[in-house]
Amino acid sequence: MAEGSRGGPACGRMEDRQDPAPSSGGCGFPEYELPELNTRAFHVGAFGELWRCRLRGKGDLSLKEPPAPAVPEGDTVADSGREDAAVARDLGCSLEAAAELRAVCGLDKLKCLEEGEDPEVIPENTDLVTLGVRKRLLEHRKETITIDRVCRQETFAYEMESHAMGKKPENPADMIEEGELILSVNILYPVIFHKHKEHKPYQTILVLGSQKLTELRDAICCVSDLQIGGEFSNTPDQAPEHISKDLYKSAFFYFEGTFYNDKRYPECRDLSRTIIEWSESHDRGYGKFQTAKMEDFTFNDLYIKLGFPYLYCHQGDCEHVVVITDIRLVHHDDCLDRTLYPLLIKKHWLWTRKCFVCKMYTARWVTNNDSFAPEDPCFFCDVCFRMLHYDSEGNKLGEFLAYPYVDPGTFN
């Protein structure tokens, strides 16, 4: 079904889907439309093969570091003379003055700090205004015990992005092949999560074209997968047996008219069946949807549009918009360890929900119909929850309902 209509990399399949624009240059190449924010649909595998055919034989696919050109000693002297002549001509000075400028202001004169000097210590005898402002700011922080959170999120984001940059695998068998495609995927917040849902990607993940859809599905981290079902006011010490991800394993991706369902486990259900039946019930004009197994398809097998919103659904009704923002060939500066992909490079930073009592620690419990709480629902850390709701013997005080709470900020 889906294998026959979407799995093949042949460029001829595209002709059945759309009329190629005169400037396309090839049916596997993504075509940008000026009035739209996304490309037209194209086959990922065919696009990658077309790209590799254009570059093959030119050395552009190599993942080896380009060697630094060796400069003979005689050429260095000649280059210095030419540089002196150019500087003398631009500045209107003599060759001797240009040579002196090169000796005094050359790159070899740029030095780091002296051995043992601490870059965090501001010297006393400085007349720089910026250092004076910095010193007063640091003194103010010590006096008021304030926490500087300026740019904390962006610093963390760039730290994640650079963590695996240029990393090589220890096992040569895990090396990414030359010409491999890398796709950038933005995972947005669940639709029911109102804050940031329209403009803040929840996660940005890099996936390889040869990886299966199930690998991306397992890499997406959502707080709804970690929820613990049940009411624990009478047994707060009881360890939960399962989290939602262990109980409800069904999920699907939706790309270009096809639902790719996760069917790896016997308990997995076809979550797309309800949507397909609703679409076909009154001829709603959506066309005929297809279904396929997520574990049977790689990203190279897909038809996609760059910049177009697709869907990832799990836990029955937790829906994430998925946007593929970029597709490119792997470069020698990328992470070349296949085992690290799908690679998380950006993650939105969230404020954690604090305990209502101490205002310090992250909430671990949420209560309803609580006679000890000023609001409903009310959030508590583990220590405050037990001190307020149980006696020294661990017996329950009063009437309330208690549920384990997983804070989204724990993913920071």
UniProtKB/Swiss-Prot annotation:
Keywords: DNA-binding, Nucleus, Transcription, Transcription regulation
Family: Belongs to the SNAPC3/SRD2 family.
Gene Ontology biological process terms, A to Z: snRNA transcription by RNA polymerase II; snRNA transcription by RNA polymerase III
Matching Pfam families: SNAPC3
Keyword Nucleus: yes
Main function: Part of the SNAPc complex required for the transcription of both RNA polymerase II and III small-nuclear RNA genes. Binds to the proximal sequence element (PSE), a non-TATA-box basal promoter element common to these 2 types of genes. Recruits TBP and BRF2 to the U6 snRNA TATA box.
Subunit-level organization: Part of the SNAPc complex composed of 5 subunits: SNAPC1, SNAPC2, SNAPC3, SNAPC4 and SNAPC5. SNAPC3 interacts with SNAPC1.
A GO CC annotation given for this chain: nucleus
GO terms assigned for molecular function: bent DNA binding; RNA polymerase III type 3 promoter sequence-specific DNA binding
Extent of Gly residues compositional bias: 1-10
InterPro entries: snRNA-activating_su3 (IPR022042)
Subcellular location: Nucleus
Protein name, UniProt field: snRNA-activating protein complex subunit 3
Region feature (Disordered): 1-28
